[in-house]
Amino acid sequence: FGITGSIAFVAGSFGSYMENLFPYIPLQIAASFAVVFVTAIHAIGVREGNALNAFGAFFKISLLLVFIVLGFATESTAAPGVLTQDKPLRSLGAEIAVFGAALASTSFAYQGNMATSFIGGEIRHPEKNMKRSMLLGMSIVTLLYLLINGVFLWAAAPHEMVKADGNGIESIGFFAAKRLFGDSIGVAFNMLIMLVFFLTLGVAIMIGSRVIYSMASRGELPKRMAHLNRRGSPVNALVLMCALSLILIWSTKLKELVESVGTLVTLTTGVAVAGVIVLRIRKPDLHRPVRIPWFPLPPIVFLSFTAWMTWSVMSTNATSVKLILGIISLALVVWFGVAKNHSRPIEKA
């Protein structure tokens, strides 16, 4: 469900940027079209889906680098005193809670690490390639995020990124591009950013469908979800992932998604990390191609940060908590009402 929320958020962002160019097209319609279209590409075959993802990775990194270089090469349009604090500081506890909630909201941006672990069984030489993928991927994502946020601050001061109703500007890339380069080039960047979100859907939908396929293969979901077509695509899993994403797109707002998905991903990742500790204790002799160094210190530190971010969200955003609890409740209903009825022992080779 964390991946489903990520798909809905990315699709909603695509729809938000499309609204900038075509205001008469509702966000939900554009987002739904993107999800269905990308799902159809992956349903055709594995080769087509992989080609879309490979092109998407190259295009996204290239566009971000161009935007960063051109942005810093342009004269700053931010109001004076970019980093000044106009409002009085809240109590230390309140500031810590707000900061933790902000971190939770951005957690899904690093979901690539989770994606690598999800498909670890399909990777050649996982003991080497998974480490390289995670370290290199996290380093690149972190660097790009720092630089792109630097460009945003170069384009506008923080208070200029807030709308009259107190909410942040959703299409921040379009806003920054117009401030730095003018309306015409800003529109061009808006179209390119739309393409970035569209291509990002490809990876999220592929990973999500593979998770469903893997669970069905182990007997944790109905067996029909493990069906592959002639070209190796898990069609039924793709359709289910598409349907769940469409439900979220039409039942929630983009702001609610961005505040909730990161927290949900943080929670589910925390549960997975806790599971690693339990598994190491219960099955110490299990073959592990990839081992955590300095165990159990890294998992404990991670779980501590997870608890802090979860507490921060609960203390600052009641609406987000309600949505998260609703999604978790739905997941439990599906698991105990459907999945467990189809579970079967894993066959040993």
Predicted regions located by residue number:
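Alpha-helical transmembrane segments of multipass membrane proteins
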Residues: 17, 36-43, 68, 149-151, ...
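A generic transmembrane alpha-helix motif of multi-pass inner-membrane proteins
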Residues: 259-264, 294-349
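C-terminal membrane-solvent junction of multi-pass transporters and transport-like membrane proteins
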Residues: 224-235, 269-320
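TM-loop-TM module centered on a large, flexible mid-protein loop between adjacent transmembrane helices
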Residues: 16, 20, 89, 103, ...
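Helix-loop-helix connectors at the membrane interface of multi-pass transporters/channels
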Residues: 11-30, 63, 120-127, 132-140, ...
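Membrane-interface loop-to-helix entry segments
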Residues: 27-80, 111, 134-138, 261-271, ...
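Hydrophobic transmembrane alpha-helices that form the core helical bundles
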Residues: 1-43, 48, 189-214, 250-267
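Hydrophobic alpha-helical segments and their helix-loop junctions in multi-pass secondary transporters
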Residues: 58-87, 150-158, 269, 274-286, ...
